[in-house]
Regions:
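A glycine-rich beta-to-alpha transition motif near the start of alpha/beta enzyme domains, typified by
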Residues: 1-126, 170-290
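Short glycine-rich anion-binding loops that position phosphate/pyrophosphate groups of nucleotides
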Residues: 15, 137, 167
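Short, solvent-exposed secondary-structure boundary/capping segments
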Residues: 128-135
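Non-cytosolic beta-sheet module surface loops
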Residues: 136, 163, 218-220
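Active-site glycine-rich loop that binds ribose-phosphate moieties when present
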Residues: 136-159, 184-186
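Internal active-site segments that recognize and position negatively charged phosphoryl groups
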Residues: 150-180
Length: 290
């Protein structure tokens, strides 16, 4: 039998967008794309939408220069092993873990991500809500109109292209089409022109529910359909606000896994609010050859 390597892990989720957290404070873990795929496999591994490696900035060569600004770097990987700039739900789970383990000295902190420094706040006596500063949405108009078609459907839908900071194509459904009628979104939607997103794109399908209230489903690049997407919720809320000026400062976004809230700051920046749960901890074993 092949020798195995024991690796501690924690399982958590933000509105059912679930993650495997790997505490690696000293930055010693060799987290290959193959290992990420194995961890996220819901039959062979633990199962998750992505992996969050928890490492101190001082021990990560890429972020050591930021150690005086942020103590921890959120190394986020998609389920297919690819790197991602940011994950709003993952950031909430990441901060929830730091708070639960006593790694935070206060309820406000800054974490490092590939998208830059991100402010976070823990709210509630039982940390019922985590707030993540998502920054400003970048409108990214393309030289050609963006359209989306779901495999198996004939309808071609217009999309709005934005970055939060990872790329999103946001589709608002016409009144004649309901979110529940779209069927599974595990297969990547057909986005045209394909060269618009050379590294892939997250696609949100959105419906208006009421004033400052929308519901959404999402196909995440490198993952498939997920129960929630934090950056996607921000992208959808931002596009909704451009379509009809908001009367308030907060959008409610319903996703299959629950509800999150997107707050609009006066300077154009967005905050993502919602729950984060830690549900299990243990040790995972994989063959050294993996």
């Amino acid at each position: 039998m092949a020798r195995v390597l024991d690796v501690p892990f924690v399982k958590g989720h933000g509105t059912e967008n679930d993650f495997v957290l790997l505490p690696d404070f000293e930055g010693r873990l060799d987290l290959t794309a193959e290992r990420v795929r194995w961890l996220c496999d819901r039959r062979k591994g633990i199962g998750a939408d992505g992996v969050l490696r928890v490492v101190r900035c001082a021990h990560d060569p890429e972020f050591a220069d930021y150690a005086d600004v942020a103590e921890f770097f959120m190394d986020y990987r998609n389920a297919d092993g690819s790197l991602a700039e940011m994950c709003g739900n993952g950031a909430r789970v990441f901060v929830r873990y730091l708070h639960a383990t006593g790694a935070l000295s206060s309820r406000t902190t800054v974490i490092a991500t590939r998208a830059g420094m991100v402010a976070a706040e823990v709210r509630g006596t039982e940390a019922e809500e985590i707030v993540i500063g998502m920054g400003a949405v970048v409108d990214s108009p393309q030289p050609l109109p963006i359209t989306v078609r779901i495999p198996g459907h004939e309808t071609v839908m217009d999309a709005t292209s934005v970055h939060v900071p990872n790329p999103h194509a946001v589709v608002f459904l016409e009144d004649t089409l309901d979110l529940d009628e779209l069927g599974p979104l595990d297969t990547p939607p057909v986005v045209t022109p394909p060269q618009a997103y050379p590294e892939g794109v997250n696609v949100e399908f959105v419906q208006h529910v009421g004033p400052e209230h929308i519901r959404m489903r999402v196909h995440e690049r490198g993952v498939g359909e997920t129960r929630s997407c934090g950056t996607g919720a921000c992208a959808a809320a931002w596009v909704a606000a451009t379509m009809s000026p908001a009367t308030g400062d907060t959008y409610r976004v319903d996703v299959p896994g629950g509800t999150v809230f997107v707050d609009f700051e006066s300077d154009g920046r967005l905050n993502l609010r919602g729950p984060a749960e830690l549900v299990a901890r243990g040790t995972v074993q994989w063959p050294r050859g993996l």
